[in-house]
Swiss-Prot record:
Complex formation: Heterotetramer of two alpha chains and two beta chains.
Family under the similarity heading: Belongs to the globin family.
A Gene Ontology molecular function term of the record: heme binding
Globin domain ranges (all copies): 2-142
KW Cell division (keyword) present: no
The protein's name in its UniProt record: Hemoglobin subunit alpha-2
Keywords assigned by UniProt, alphabetized: Heme, Iron, Metal-binding, Oxygen transport, Transport
Length: 142
């Protein structure tokens, strides 16, 4: 799915409002995913998955950092996320459906924290962006 100029603008503006909360939102999205889709917990058997756990917060920071990097390189997501794609495909072997579940959880988290900014157009742009990120992260599974 190609991001239009309007999509890119919406994604950059929305992520810009996330700012210093990115790590916290990443952790919240992970917690939301674990609660809503319990099967996703199987990829984190060594984590303390309780609310506010340091491990979930740390992984939320990693997720947020990767997305922040991706937002900064919207025209080269494959190059930007290549290492993460390798990691998830070859070492972690995460089922690709889980990226969609995390994307959904992140969209809900962003909508909860920024309801007035989460217009239908912004929602659609963020959804396309996260779908593109998911596609890149699963590209090396083939």
């Amino acid at each position: 799915m190609v991001l239009s100029a309007a999509d890119k603008s919406n994604v950059k503006a929305a992520w810009g409002k996330v700012g210093s909360n990115a790590g916290a939102y990443g952790a919240e999205a992970l917690e939301r995913m674990f609660l809503s889709f319990p099967t996703t917990k199987t990829y984190f058997p060594h984590f303390d998955l309780s609310h506010g756990s340091a491990q979930v917060k740390g992984h939320g920071e990693k997720v947020a950092a990767a997305l922040t990097k991706a937002v900064g390189h919207l025209d080269d997501l494959p190059g930007t996320l290549s290492d993460l794609s390798d990691l998830h495909a070859h070492k972690l072997r995460v089922d690709p459906v889980n990226f969609k579940l995390l994307s959904h959880s992140l969209l809900v988290t962003l909508a909860c924290h920024h309801p007035s900014d989460f217009t239908p157009a912004v929602h659609a742009s963020l959804d396309k962006f996260l779908a593109n990120v998911s596609t890149v992260l699963t590209s090396k599974y083939r």
